[in-house]
Amino acid sequence: MTILFISDLHLSPLRPDITDCFIDFMQNEAIHAEKLYVLGDLFEFWIGDDDNSPFNVLVKNEFKALTKKGVKCYFIQGNRDFLLNKRFCKETGVELLDDHTVIDLDGEKVLIMHGDTLCIDDIKYQEFRAKVHKPWLQWVFNRIPLFIRQRIVKNVQDKIKEKKQTKTLCIMDVTQSEVERVMQEEGVQRLIHGHTHRPDTHTFISNDKEMTRIVLGDWYSQGSILEYSDKIYSLHKKEFK
């Protein structure tokens, strides 16, 4: 049994190298897996399931082809694609999961998430996240004409770039106390997440138990894949062609 995890691809028409790497992964690696989990930020920005641009259709077709081959695909919303919803899933066969989801891997309970909720020291971001995740606000936003939403998102992108330059690295990383709190609350000893773009495996002791936190990498300069097979977790790099 092989299960794959990816996150933070930030797919965009402006980065055909990432797109090519993603398509190669879907057609030559994911096709041989039993399950594929996408833990958020698949897209650089997703402004609504009604955006059927040629690029979005291209990506959706890759998932549709994969699920039709019998590979189960799951998606957790990230901070860039939290508006990806039921229509996308219906069109592709992908199953949308809760922000915090516990899965069973050979009898072990494993918590999976995007990871942005763990960065509680970034107070401004958490306040922004709370606002944009309000159901009524998303309902209103999704009913704004598509071309206006595109302008709004472009403005938001520019502001995000400006703010990132002023934030310290520690603020943009997870808060260890929050990691431990969430893992204890969910009753797990293993956590898999993305968001921080810092692929690594961290082990620590909490309440006399050994805990493991696996961080997925981004796809900015190369692909990053976590493979689970025969109870072994392996982080792999995938070079751009």
UniProtKB/Swiss-Prot annotation:
What's a Pfam family in this record? Metallophos
The answer to whether keyword Cell membrane applies is yes
Q: Which GO terms describe its molecular function?
A: manganese ion binding; UDP-2,3-diacylglucosamine hydrolase activity
Q: In which pathway does it act?
A: Glycolipid biosynthesis; lipid IV(A) biosynthesis; lipid IV(A) from (3R)-3-hydroxytetradecanoyl-[acyl-carrier-protein] and UDP-N-acetyl-alpha-D-glucosamine: step 4/6
**What's one GO-annotated cellular component?**
extrinsic component of plasma membrane
- The enzyme's E.C. designation: 3.6.1.54
Cell location = Cell inner membrane
Residues reported in the UniProt entry to bind Mn(2+) 2:
D41, N79, H114, H195
Q: How is the cofactor bound?
A: Binds 2 Mn(2+) ions per subunit in a binuclear metal center.
Q: Which residues bind Mn(2+) 1?
A: D8, H10, D41, H197
Catalyzed reactions? UDP-2-N,3-O-bis[(3R)-3-hydroxytetradecanoyl]-alpha-D-glucosamine + H2O = 2-N,3-O-bis[(3R)-3-hydroxytetradecanoyl]-alpha-D-glucosaminyl 1-phosphate + UMP + 2 H(+)
Q: What is its main location?
A: membrane
What membrane topology term does the record carry?
Peripheral membrane protein
Q: Report the cofactors.
A: Mn(2+)
Q: Which UniProt keywords apply?
A: Cell inner membrane, Cell membrane, Hydrolase, Lipid A biosynthesis, Lipid biosynthesis, Lipid metabolism, Manganese, Membrane, Metal-binding
Q: Where does substrate bind?
A: N79, R80, D122, K164, K167, H195
Q: Which GO terms describe its biological process?
A: lipid A biosynthetic process
Q: What is the purpose of this protein?
A: Hydrolyzes the pyrophosphate bond of UDP-2,3-diacylglucosamine to yield 2,3-diacylglucosamine 1-phosphate (lipid X) and UMP by catalyzing the attack of water at the alpha-P atom. Involved in the biosynthesis of lipid A, a phosphorylated glycolipid that anchors the lipopolysaccharide to the outer membrane of the cell.
PANTHER family (UniProt xref): UDP-2,3-DIACYLGLUCOSAMINE HYDROLASE, UDP-2,3-DIACYLGLUCOSAMINE HYDROLASE-RELATED
Q: Which family does it belong to?
A: Belongs to the LpxH family.
Q: What is this protein called?
A: UDP-2,3-diacylglucosamine hydrolase
Q: Which organism is it from?
A: Aliivibrio fischeri (strain MJ11)
